[in-house]
């Protein structure tokens, strides 16, 4: 129905432009939305307020001209001006019941549209370094990215989900060397484990798997491994005034880099055994963890596969005049495209930078023919946006194709206290631990219930509580309640008959029932808005509101009554609520239980 109203308003704009009331180049960015207050009709447009300045008249005066030119719209009984210049549209009574037919006909597909059918979108998300298990921060990116992809697909887009595997960087070398040092320890070689190495027990498990397969084939003298390696960092026993460690001597970065270099030299090709064993073990763990979380990918893209693409990207930038040499390094002129400073893409030792890999990766994405590229990054990567967009423009592509969505950090709270989390020390709360504590449903739901750029305080106690304060429980309970109601009805002579029930829909004449019908009809619009804004929380909030309307109505009004017609009508309304709840929960990756 909103499509028909919008078409009528578009017709009015053309007429007013022809009459010279609105400029011929006026861009209509007004909105047509469902009203929250039934006394204001079913739909409201702000077109008169948006266009008043361009028309050079007061909003209400322009609204009168709009109404005078408005063609007849089927099933609209009246349109009137309200407040500062809103135009409210009222549906006839029969049209309010049309949503019941739409939901019954479309079932699990109700709400889905083809508004983004011409888009081919790649959504890259999580992309955590394969150096340890996923932590709760990665979990938010996983839930958010998967749900954004679901929403885009539900609005007709062709979507590819991709995980970028950072399998060629320094962190992988730190992990490989950490594994090698644990390997030496397990084979009886005493050593002082580096402070900057990966500390978790999983490193020992990977090392043991290599021992089980190859024995002591890679054992070398610890003295040789540590030969000429800069001193590791030494900290004072007491913290400074801000609670930070005080460095007395040494350098943890130079220390681990020295160990990496020595390990590579001493065991030669054997180093790859540790690198690949660690990569496979961690990546398999990540894949299993995400699959159990309901998060899947169409492609796992290896950074190591980009060698030739890096050369191609840098050659393209050079040919277009955007590279220069300074102090032995090769720099990209990113400041020409709005970045705050130029960026190194190749160091004087010939090694390309992580940024060079990023440029090559985005070149590869663009060459795959996507109309839109969506990158979902941790908020700490905010500074990378300008330089990546600069590189895209410099290579001759359109950086507006790239949308970067930042995901803020997550804090866990239990018993009113924040749960501490860190990484290399091995003392971090994993996604798997969170899922085991609160369940997949609560994790998937609460991870997306705020805008991605907003911090989340995840209340573990609330997430497992069985109360209306726990939104996911409240929504799921509404679904289960309807299942139980239908089961009870079908066990008696009040068995639900959909065809018969539709004949009695006009018995749904309570204000609460009219409100539920309007809320059901609003779902497709909410879905489109949520998809185009990359805001899954809009679906979550909608489901909370729909569940609240249903619970309130159910608690106040008996569904299974002695009146057969009324019972059938109310069961019909309940069944449609059930379907929409299930559809919305499915998009969020949350189950719709039949019993609770």
UniProtKB/Swiss-Prot annotation:
Catalyses which reaction(s): tRNA(Arg) + L-arginine + ATP = L-arginyl-tRNA(Arg) + AMP + diphosphate
A GO term from the CC aspect: cytoplasm
Known partners and oligomeric status: Monomer.
Membrane-spanning intervals of the chain: none
Principal EC category: ligase
Pfam families hit by this protein: Arg_tRNA_synt_N, DALR_1, tRNA-synt_1d
Annotated protein name in UniProt: Arginine--tRNA ligase
Molecular function terms, GO-annotated: arginine-tRNA ligase activity; ATP binding
InterPro entries to which the protein is assigned, alphabetical: Arg-tRNA-ligase (IPR001278), Arg-tRNA-synth_N (IPR005148), Arg-tRNA-synth_N_sf (IPR036695), ArgRS_core (IPR035684), DALR_anticod-bd (IPR008909), Rossmann-like_a/b/a_fold (IPR014729), tRNAsynth_Ia_anticodon-bd (IPR009080)
Family: Belongs to the class-I aminoacyl-tRNA synthetase family.
Enzyme Commission numbers on file: 6.1.1.19
Subcellular location: Cytoplasm
Keyword ATP-binding: yes
GO terms for biological process, alphabetical: arginyl-tRNA aminoacylation
Alphabetic keyword roster: Aminoacyl-tRNA synthetase, ATP-binding, Cytoplasm, Ligase, Nucleotide-binding, Protein biosynthesis
Extent of motif 'HIGH' region: 128-138
Record carries keyword Membrane: no
